[in-house]
Amino acid sequence: MPSLFEKILRTGDRKTLKRLHVYADAINTLEDSFQTFTDAELREETDKLRARHADGESLDDLLPEAFAAVREGSRRTLGMRQFDVQLMGGAALHLGNIAEMKTGEGKTLVATAPAYLNGLSGKGVHIVTTNDYLASYQSELMGRVHRFMGLTSGCILSAQEPSERRLQYAADVTYGTNNEFGFDYLRDNMAWSSEELVQRGHHFAIVDEVDSILIDEARTPLIISGPASGDANRWYGEFAKVVLRLDVDDDYEVDEKKRTVGVLEPGIEKVEDYLGISNLYESANTPLIGFLNNAIKAKELFKRDKDYVILDGEVLIVDEHTGRILAGRRYNEGMHQAIEAKESVEIKAENQTLATVTLQNYFRLYEKLSGMTGTAETEASEFMGTYELGVVAIPTNKPMVRIDQSDLVYKNEVVKFEAVVKDIEERHKEGQPVLVGTTSVEKSEYLSKQLSKLGIKHEVLNAKNHAREASIVAQAGRKGAVTVATNMAGRGTDIMLGGNAEFNAVTELAKRGLDPEETPEEYEAAWAEAYEKAQEATEEEHEEVVELGGLYVLGTERHESRRIDNQLRGRSGRQGDPGESRFYLSLTDDLMRLFNSGAAERLMGRSVMPDDQALESKLVSKAIASAQGQVEGRNAEQRKNVLKYDDVLNRQREAIYGDRRRILEGDDLHEKVQHFLEDTVNESIDATTAEGHAEGWDYKALWSSLGTLYPIGLTADDVAEEVGGLANVTSDVLKREILSDAKLAYQGREEKLGSETIRELERRVVLSVIGRKWQEHLYEMDYLKEGIGLRAMAQRDPLVEYQREGFVMFQAMMGAIREESVGFLFNLEVQVEEAPAASAGVQANQPSALLDRVNGEDAGAEAHASAKPVLNAPGLAEPERPSQLQFTAPDASGEAETRIERRSTAGSAGDSNLPPSARKTNKPAPKRKKRR
């Protein structure tokens, strides 16, 4: 029964659909006139539309003409004319909605029109995909449309250098993955200079597979971390040995459903005996508990060849949803090290957080957000609640005629797979293409062996064979094809009956050495013929496969999420083609075993049928739906929890990152530094004068404290004399006199160094202190969050406590930033060198045609017209980055994975450090507050 909120959402959906139909009709009336334009005239439309928008005309008003232009542009470049429903989907995206469009409806092409329209503003459009392959493929293919229409397109890939990334972001339309966009945001906020910044704002984003990215992956935050101090690695090896002496149920408990472990009293005693300690839970031994829990999890919850594989002595994570190896990715919180110790391979060092953000809060940065997927309505309320995104179900271009058969349920997996193989064999004999979905690499390989025994030629698509995955998927609809895939979510390439003509044409041109960006003219000249030949080759076979019933999708197990089941089914029956789907299940499948074991046991107990006979039961369907509902509910709760806690940190992050960005972009900090000086002096005086009367205040301690900040030029006696005696001294008098003295001292410092030098010194010092203090604050917030759950035992709300203590810690950090900045500005010994001439090399890395349009025609000249003075002060040199950084992000299932990036270039303010020896001239070093 739909809730009231869901009914309201559906009402809004119907109103939006009416508006989209109006837009589609308006675009259709323009189609004939746009077809009469020459290529040059069509490109001129872009300049006209851009000028009209600059003159104040809204993008909504320009939509019909812009979409009509793109429809004609895509017809001429790709040979693809957008259907009315594709235009409706594009309009829904422009209006800031999620367009729910079934698999095969051409979502990649849909994105071109709203991207073009919003690209006219010159602020940049980001098209977000799930992996580098799709980003690159879509950028090359759809980028041809944008370039034909006079826009620029770019692509962000994980291996690119910062200079290349900056160029790609300067384009009108930029493709990339959610993780790369998020990590670039974090990197920008660790930057030491404006030259390191790559992103230029967050204007409009179109998120492909939006449910996967904004829902499934939103449980895990993006984290950039660097090597932590201390040698913890030896403990992983020790505890890997310890857990081999422990027995499940006797020494520890395991909950596979919640993926948690708990150590029992006998187990604790064994661990204490092995380590030679009296109490594992003493405060000094507390860190060891984490090593023990991770070692047990590695032993019981992480299975080789299912969750990870060992290749060349490395533990490589396997994506449980896509079945692909996630090269360079690592589990966080010590879990990867525990698995390495279990497998006796090299254990690599742990890290500490340098920057972090959740996907929810990253995507909330965009002025306008939209998305596409085939399966979004089940999460409509979460999209609205978290992102303020409505879901609009776009009609299919042709009616769906796929037949979804009822599930067949067997008592155990062995007989289930026997039935699966028999079904595949019968379909294969007829020539009908079969797509088989499995939930793990292990099961795909087991099924592959069974098919090989029968001599059935097939392709396996899993973590150990990802290099050819796009070509395998592209041919999965051909006559007689059998494809065994470990989860089809996020594969991207369309399965077309008879073969994928578009993919085949792209492959053919690549074989000829043609590239749409490197050799655009030759590519465009060859495309029409290559695409036509590919279409001819596939059309005849398409008709044969249609006669055979289309693509048969066979699922060997239900996934945890209903959406992923629907995505597998949705591979069949695209664009009105026939198709069929069926799931083969067993009562011992993981989903039933973990989440509805009681129902499974009751069914097995009741049934008197032989093992090899299938059950078709509504009770089974209800049990499966209940199990999937439990998983989805658990994951939704995790996402809510992650967001609640990150919202606390997000307000702090926005304040700090906003300050850093303004500093990097050249804001004058003189006024801010004066406020720092006032606040720091006032805080010191308030601390001294909080209790008692003037005669009893500790002036010696106050003057000692102020002496660490600046060369104080008056004494307590001077102040008393000014007001006629010590009895007349008040807190306000002290503030007035000391602040006046401090500002005179700063004015003298500026006169000595020069205004330009002091402005650059302010920028460098404040940036450095903010970077270091923010990094320390992240560590402390992590530490706070880890232990905050224990507050519930004292009948206190952990979230409220986290908010309260996090605010206190943030205020303490801001005070420390003010105090240390003032101390460094007064006390650092600075040598000023003559500024070098503007570097030609810098300009060489910034192609003028693209960047000048983004930054203004004279941007390059302004940037280099007046070079900043070169300051030589200990600790102010651009800091060294760690030799390697780790980037932790969600995989397709939402679990954390980490990739390592080794670096040799200079680094970021997040890593900056002013050594104690550099913090003084002839004065004591600035006082540092101790923060817990």
Curated annotation (Swiss-Prot):
Annotated ATP binding sites: 86, 104-108, 494
ATP-binding among keywords: yes
Mode of membrane association: Peripheral membrane protein
Any one cellular-component term (Gene Ontology): plasma membrane
UniProtKB keywords: ATP-binding, Cell membrane, Cytoplasm, Membrane, Nucleotide-binding, Protein transport, Translocase, Translocation, Transport
PROSITE patterns per the UniProt record, alphabetical: SECA, SECA_MOTOR_DEAD
Pfam (any one): SecA_SW
Record's compositionally biased regions (Basic residues): 920-932
InterPro entries: Helicase_ATP-bd, Helicase_C-like, P-loop_NTPase, SecA, SecA_CS, SecA_DEAD, SecA_motor_DEAD, SecA_preprotein_X-link_dom
BP term (GO), one: protein transport by the Sec complex
Residue ranges of the region described as Disordered: 857-932
Keyword Transport: yes
Entry's localization field: Cell membrane; Cytoplasm
GO molecular function, one term: ATP binding
Main location: membrane
Biased composition (Polar residues): 905-915
Catalytic reaction annotation: ATP + H2O + cellular proteinSide 1 = ADP + phosphate + cellular proteinSide 2
Record-stated family: Belongs to the SecA family.
HAMAP family: SecA
PANTHER family per UniProt: CHLOROPLAST PROTEIN-TRANSPORTING ATPASE (PTHR30612:SF0), SECA INNER MEMBRANE COMPONENT OF SEC PROTEIN SECRETION SYSTEM (PTHR30612)
Biological role stated in the UniProt entry: Part of the Sec protein translocase complex. Interacts with the SecYEG preprotein conducting channel. Has a central role in coupling the hydrolysis of ATP to the transfer of proteins into and across the cell membrane, serving as an ATP-driven molecular motor driving the stepwise translocation of polypeptide chains across the membrane.
Subunit composition and interactions: Monomer and homodimer. Part of the essential Sec protein translocation apparatus which comprises SecA, SecYEG and auxiliary proteins SecDF. Other proteins may also be involved.
Matches recorded under NCBIfam families: PRK12904.1 (NF009538), secA (TIGR00963)
Entry protein name: Protein translocase subunit SecA
Organism: Renibacterium salmoninarum (strain ATCC 33209 / DSM 20767 / JCM 11484 / NBRC 15589 / NCIMB 2235)
Gene: secA
